[in-house]
Swiss-Prot record:
The gene is coaD. Belongs to the bacterial CoaD family. It comes from the Bacteria. This is Phosphopantetheine adenylyltransferase. Its EC number is 2.7.7.3. It is an enzyme of class 2 (transferase). GO terms for molecular function: ATP binding; pantetheine-phosphate adenylyltransferase activity. Gene3D superfamilies: HUPs. Pathway: Cofactor biosynthesis; coenzyme A biosynthesis; CoA from (R)-pantothenate: step 4/5.
């Protein structure tokens, strides 16, 4: 069985993320959307909330599951028996950071490939940052993220008042 991980903060998950995961299942038998549990950035949603949103959003995607991890990404890939790390690129500006990370991962474990999928045309402009920004300004980002996420964003920003 060919397993890949698709790591990210998924804060929150967007249709762009789901598109990459869906397309990765054409290449791999199982895709694990791996939620990083200790990211360096401030997050809107907790790890548990992000996992819940991801699991709900991927419920209809065969061969996709969500898990959290708090180790180096390449070490998590090894732990779950993955042969590849999937990354999505939206624009050329994403390339440099992804290239550097791929080089680090290849140095740590040359047996784990990095597979980059270009964002599909309708999704290339979608980012979690833009989704959070829209929601913080009172606009429901229904075009960019699943309904469960829209509802969670509404609730989160209502709590912040």
């Amino acid at each position: 069985m060919r397993i890949a991980i698709y790591p990210g903060s998924f804060d929150p998950v967007t249709y762009a993320h789901l598109d990459i995961a869906r397309r990765a299942t054409r290449i791999f038998d199982r895709v694990i959307m791996a939620v990083f549990d200790r990211p360096q950035k401030r997050l809107l949603f907790s790890t548990e909330e992000r996992l819940h949103l991801l699991r709900t959003a991927t419920a209809d995607l065969d061969h996709v599951e969500a898990m959290s991890y708090n180790t180096l990404t390449v070490e998590f890939a090894r732990q779950v028996g993955a042969c590849a790390i999937v990354r999505g690129l939206r624009a050329g500006s994403d390339f440099e950071a992804e290239f550097q990370m791929a080089q680090v991962n290849q140095t740590i474990d040359p047996g784990i490939e990095v597979v980059v999928l270009m964002a599909g045309r309708p999704f290339a402009h979608i980012s979690s940052t833009a989704v959070r920004e829209m929601a913080s300004l009172g606009r429901d980002p229904v075009e960019f993220t699943p309904p469960v996420v829209v509802a969670a964003l509404r609730e989160k920003f209502a709590q912040r008042g």
